[in-house]
Design a protein with these regions (language model features):
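Asp-based, Mg2+/Mn2+-dependent phosphohydrolase catalytic module
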Residues: 2-9, 14-32, 44-69, 76-301, ...
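N-terminal phosphate-binding loop and flanking beta/alpha elements of the actin-like ATPase fold
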Residues: 36
């Protein structure tokens, strides 16, 4: 059975600047098995080359840029495929700017077709410019729905979703969110896996991630197998909160090493049944814009007062 793998990075392969135990052996086992694999991240700031270098520094060298697919690349693919000839005003940097440039999507600070929001430094001046562009008819597009992203074991930073939400509130216009769990991210990632096989079809595609709202939800809605690892942002007791459930629940990617080496999948393919007592948890806030229930109509803007 030919299986392809889509793999989240933060919380699955590394945390902060350290590899998760077993991650290096897992990647080596993947390469040894001959299975096609792509690292799939909502972070729009790095380029695939940046991510390859980072993994090399952490102890997983030799991966080419074709093994990485970011929400920046997904955004550029979406615009190039659905609106060729469009222009953009960008709030973002690094990987997002590079991806748009490589797709020959020009920047336009006067009358852009889209305001595109990614990760990176944000100024009030740039937000005001984006607001003006949207009021002038530009559509609002976010590379991903993440309101916040972890930067350390104790700290976070605002994400693209939070910036897009600011502009939604100020303009009354809805953003369209790409990246995980949007089906277009999984559609393009699936295409990359097939290209790696030389066009041969895959009997099975597995998404391995640590976040229920993006990795697992997106995989299930795309018809993929969804493997949740508990080495990142999700705790086992929180699974009772979700209507959708992963195909398997693993401690970390280390649990898959022997399967990859032997080529024999475990007979235990279903998630365990969690019969956990109700747990009171402090809700910090929705991590993703897709967590917030919304209507498919423009958000009303409060009248201005003078």
């Amino acid at each position: 059975m030919k299986t392809g793998y889509l793999i989240d990075m933060d919380g699955v392969i590394y945390r902060e600047n350290q590899l998760i135990p077993g991650a290096r052996d897992f990647v080596e086992a993947l390469i040894g098995s001959g299975a096609p694999f792509v690292f799939l991240t909502n972070n729009s700031a790095p380029t695939p080359e940046d991510l390859s270098v980072r993994l090399g520094h952490l102890g997983i060298p030799g991966l080419s840029s074709r093994h990485f697919y970011t929400s920046a690349l997904n955004t550029a693919d979406f615009l190039g495929e659905t609106h060729p000839g469009c222009t953009v005003f960008v709030i973002g940097e690094g990987g997002l700017l590079t991806a748009l440039h490589e797709r020959r999507i020009p920047n336009d600070g006067l009358h852009p077709s889209y305001v595109v929001v990614g990760e990176g430094a944000v100024s009030m001046e740039k937000l005001a410019k984006a607001h003006s562009c949207i009021e002038g008819g530009a559509r609002l597009l976010a590379t991903n729905p993440d309101n916040w992203c972890p930067v350390s074991s104790e700290g976070t930073r605002p994400g693209a979703g939070a910036t897009a939400a600011f502009l939604e509130a100020s303009t009354g216009r809805r953003a369209y969110y790409l990246g995980k769990p949007n089906g277009y991210m999984f559609h393009r990632a699936r295409r990359k896996l097939v290209e790696m096989t030389g066009g041969s079809s895959l009997e099975e595609i597995v998404m391995i991630g640590d976040t229920m709202e993006t990795d697992i939800r997106g995989a299930i809605e795309a018809g993929l197998h969804a493997y949740l690892v508990l080495s990142g942002s999700t705790q086992a007791e929180s699974l009772i909160d979700y209507v959708y459930q992963p195909t398997r629940v693993l401690g970390s990617v280390a649990d898959l090493i022997e399967e990859l080496r032997s080529g024999k999948p475990s007979s235990r393919l279903d998630s365990p049944v969690f019969s956990l007592p109700g747990v009171k948890r402090r809700r910090v806030g929705n991590r993703h814009q897709t967590d917030i229930q919304v209507h498919n109509k423009p958000r009303p803007r409060a009248p201005m007062t003078r």
